[in-house]
Every structure is written in structure tokens, then in C-alpha cells.
A protein has these predicted regions:
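Short, acidic/hydrophobic/Gly-rich beta-strand patch recurrent on exposed beta strands
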Residues: 23-28, 147-150, 214-216, 344
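Extended interfacial segments that mediate partner engagement and assembly in macromolecular machines
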Residues: 60-72, 78-187, 207, 222
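Terminal RNA-binding accessory module
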Residues: 1-72, 76, 357-358, 365
Length: 454
């Protein structure tokens, strides 16, 4: 055990930021994780919980602020669990993310020369989210409030106007709150599993201006629906109003079923020239502006001239597949979630694209099977796996198929580095790497890498 005890005070300088956004400082070789700090801050902190070689501490006082420290724009930035980097100047956030990618590629990937292009940041890193799910609760004076969960808890921090979200959120939430008060609707209580009103889902198509509201309820129907619809329709752009029944004791927000109250049951949006239909339950990237840049980069790296056969592994609802299909002869998508593939096929039809075909299944099963049985071929393979990266069987099959180019889109640069190393040891050369900031003020960063067969 360390000699540190709870509530011990100490001084340290923040040198780095953890995966989850805490500042990292040291005292005589002991490592501290301290929330709400920025690289370069000299702080006084208080020990909360200690292990053998590291501990968690609470920031008590900033003794000397980092030159990159800024006043968070959002008044609840410190309590809310949503943003980790708001106190860091946006330029510095981008530098931090770029360095994270670079460090992982050198430390884990073993690369010495990294052909890195400047990270793609946002010109305006606020109000970029097209989707929000607001929980409802009571404050100490028994007022109805909504906002966001404080980090790692279910206590609600009141905030109707998150600065990452759209401006319409606030007006929509006011209408829903007024409706609850007017008709005495009860809030859902997680502990007793009683009460009706659960989360409110709000989505917007940034290119179309279309708005969607879906109210989640613990009950069969939403009382006084007509009055609610009438009020919500006063908001310009309101296109789809529905409710979702979720009677389970669960942290999952949406129920499986959606009942339509107004409109076609979906909204539409575009990424580039490709149109997407978004229903309350369908997956859609939350930052459409950066998604367009990210997929634009993937498309550029794919180097398509119109004659290529492309595989898009981990394709989700086919966003990248359809983007590529604009410039390829044929695109095959593979995704494990059947519902996502239904959406992908629907979106292909919506855009009149006939040169795409989708498979439901694991990439590491579908690809080897198609390769061994049907000798399928690829000029280019694009992968966009979840955080854990690609399965080795999948990488191995890619190597066997020997496409000229592999484009790797990643949301975790540590597993990216591991997988790139595997491919680089088997005939591929790392030709380009570029970060893209999809989630300003959070610690996350997306990366696109291009590998070329040598
Ligand atoms: N490119 C997609 C998003 C990819 S997110 C888009 O833009 O919509 C990663 C996707 O991989 C998720 O949809 C997830 O369901 C899927 N997935 C996870 N494990 C998988 C596996 N073993 N094989 C295929 N798909 C998988």
C-alpha cells in the first residue's frame, strides 16, 4: 500500500490526460488521476482513493493555471459527465488528440516514420450533436428537471441547453415539461419502477432541418397526445412525433416499439449527396458535419476510379458503403446487427444504388467464408470496427485476399495501432494517417489510416 491516506493534500503539475479525461500528475513516482484539470495546471489536490502506485484525487485549488486553460462555456461543465476537456483551449484539444494517435502508433504499433496529416477539427466546435436523450427527474424542491447524468451516476444535473446540442432542445423540453404539469403526468422513478415519463429523445437532420421527438414511457399510451402534438408543432421543422414503450427495469433508454403520433415515422438527412432515413431506433452518426469529413477522407484514401470492387467491413447502416458506392463498381458491406443491415438496404434503395450488397454476420466469419467458398475479390477493403478493433481472423483474411489498399477507420487508436502493426508485418505499408475530431470537448478521437500493398 502507498503511504497516502484519504484527504491528504498535495501539490502537483498535470502532465497528461487519461483515456477518460482526468488530468495525470505525479508525486515522487506516484501517479494521480485528477478530474477537471488541464495539462500544465499546477494544482493543490486532495487524495480520495489510493492503490499501490496510483490514486484518484480531487482538485482543490488551481495554484497556477495552464496557459491552455479556458473558462468552460457551459455553466455545468464540471458536474456534468458529458464533456471532459471543456477547460482546455480547443486548439490544444486537437494537439492532445493528435499526440494520442501518434504515441499509440509509435508505442503500440512500433512505427518509426508516421505519415501523419493534420487532424481535422471543427471550425465551430459547439452545437454539433444531432441527437440527445434527456432523462427527467425531481430536484430537492420537487420541481421537474431534465438535463444530464453527472459522471458515472444517475443523479441529474439540470441543464436544458447543452452547448453541444441543438438550440431547439430547450424549447422542446419546455413544452414537454408544461405538458406533464398541465395533465399531472408522473415521472418514472428508477427505484420503484413506477411513473410514466422516461427519457425524451430529440434528433435533427442538419441538412434538412427536420426535427424528431420520441417520448419514452413506462405505460401503454401517452395521455392527451393531441395537445402535446399541437404544442410541439409550433416548433419550426417538427417532422416526426412518436412515443416508445419501455416497461423494463433497465438502463437501456429506448423501448423496442415505437408508436407514431405525427408525421411519417422518420426524418431524413444527407451526408454529402447520400440521403438517409432516420427512425427513432436507427443508428446514425451524431456529428454529421465531421462524419462527412471523416468519410470523405476514407473515400479519398480508397482512391476509387469507378472500376473497383470494395468490401466495407463493420458497415453499420451502410453509411460508408453508400458513400463509396458513388465511386466504385461494387461495394459489399458486412455487419453483425440484422436491423442495421435492414436500414442499410433501405438506404441503398432510397438512393437508387444497385451496386451494393449487404451481408449479416461477423466480419471474421463472413469474409473468410466468402473468400474460401466463392473466391470473392477486393481492390480495396475498408474497416470501421468497434473499440476492440478487428479480429485476427479478419485481418488474416484481408492479408490473404491482398487488396491494393486497406482503409482503416478507427475510434480507438490503441487497437488501431495493434492492427496496423499486424498488417505492416504482412506486406502492407502505412501510407497516410489522419485524425478527425468527431467529439470536441470529449477525450475521443477518430482516425483514418491508409495501408498500401507493397
Ligand atoms: N461504419 C458504420 C459504423 C461502424 S461502428 C457507420 O458509419 O454507420 C462498428 C459497427 O461494427 C457496429 O455497427 C457494430 O454493430 C458492428 N460490429 C461489431 N462487431 C462486429 C463483427 N464482429 N463483425 C461485423 N460487425 C461488427
Amino acid at each position: 500500500m502507498s503511504e497516502w491516506k484519504k484527504n491528504d493534500k498535495f501539490e502537483t503539475v498535470i502532465e497528461d490526460i487519461s483515456e477518460t479525461g482526468e488530468g495525470i500528475g505525479k508525486t515522487d513516482g506516484f501517479t494521480w488521476f485528477i478530474k477537471d484539470t488541464v495539462i500544465g495546471d499546477r494544482v493543490e489536490a486532495k487524495a480520495m482513493k489510493t492503490k499501490k502506485s496510483y490514486g484518484f484525487a480531487r482538485m482543490e485549488r488551481i495554484l497556477e493555471p495552464s496557459k491552455n486553460r479556458v473558462e468552460p462555456k457551459c455553466p455545468v461543465a464540471r458536474q456534468c459527465g458529458g464533456c471532459q476537456l471543456q477547460a482546455m483551449d480547443y486548439k490544444e484539444q486537437l494537439t492532445f488528440k493528435e499526440r494520442k494517435i501518434y504515441n499509440n502508433l509509435t508505442r503500440i504499433g512500433g512505427f518509426t516514420e508516421i505519415p501523419m496529416l493534420p487532424i481535422i477539427g471543427m471550425d465551430e466546435p459547439w452545437r454539433y450533436r444531432n441527437k440527445a436523450q434527456f432523462p427527467w427527474g425531481m430536484d430537492k424542491e420537487d420541481n421537474i428537471i431534465t438535463g444530464f447524468y453527472a459522471g458515472r451516476t444517475h443523479s441529474i444535473i439540470g441543464c436544458e441547453d447543452c452547448l453541444l446540442g441543438i438550440e431547439e432542445n430547450e424549447d422542446i423540453l419546455k413544452i414537454i415539461k408544461a405538458h406533464m404539469e398541465r395533465f399531472g403526468l408522473r415521472l418514472y422513478d428508477e427505484e420503484t419502477h413506477k411513473g410514466l415519463i422516461r427519457h425524451t429523445l430529440i434528433r435533427k437532420g442538419f441538412k434538412t432541418g427536420e426535427l424528431m421527438v420520441c417520448q419514452v414511457i413506462n405505460g401503454k399510451s401517452l395521455p392527451h397526445q393531441e395537445e402535446l402534438v399541437e404544442e410541439l408543432l409550433k416548433i419550426p421543422g417538427m417532422t416526426s412525433i412518436s412515443y416508445s414503450v419501455n416497461r423494463e427495469k433497465t438502463n437501456v433508454i429506448m423501448g423496442n416499439q415505437v408508436e407514431n403520433l405525427y408525421g411519417p415515422g422518420y426524418i431524413s438527412d444527407y451526408i454529402g449527396d447520400v440521403k438517409y432515413r432516420i427512425s427513432p431506433l436507427s443508428f446514425y452518426q451524431v456529428n454529421p458535419v465531421q462524419t462527412e469529413k471523416l468519410y470523405g477522407t476514407a473515400l479519398e484514401y480508397a482512391g476509387l476510379t469507378g472500376g473497383e470492387t470494395v468490401w466495407d467491413l463493420y458497415c453499420g447502416i451502410g453509411t460508408i458503403s453508400l458513400f463509396l458506392a458513388q465511386k466504385a463498381k461494387k461495394v459489399y458491406g458486412v455487419e453483425i446487427v440484422p436491423q442495421a443491415i435492414e436500414d442499410a438496404r433501405e438506404n441503398a434503395k432510397l438512393n437508387g444504388m444497385e451496386n451494393v450488397e449487404f451481408f449479416v454476420g461477423k466480419a471474421e466469419e463472413v469474409l473468410p467464408e466468402q473468400f474460401e467458398k466463392n473466391q470473392v475479390y477486393a481492390d480495396v477493403i475498408v474497416v470501421d470496427p468497434p473499440r476492440k478493433g478487428c479480429d485476427e481472423v479478419c485481418l488474416d483474411t484481408i492479408v490473404k485476399m491482398g487488396p491494393k489498399r486497406v482503409v482503416y477507420v478507427s475510434c480507438d487508436s490503441a487497437t488501431l495501432a495493434r492492427d496496423l502493426k499486424y498488417l505492416a508485418e504482412r506486406g502492407y505499408e502505412l501510407s497516410r494517417v489522419r485524425g478527425c475530431d468527431m467529439f470536441p470537448h470529449s477525450g475521443h478521437v477518430e482516425t483514418v489510416a491508409l495501408l498500401t500493398l507493397v
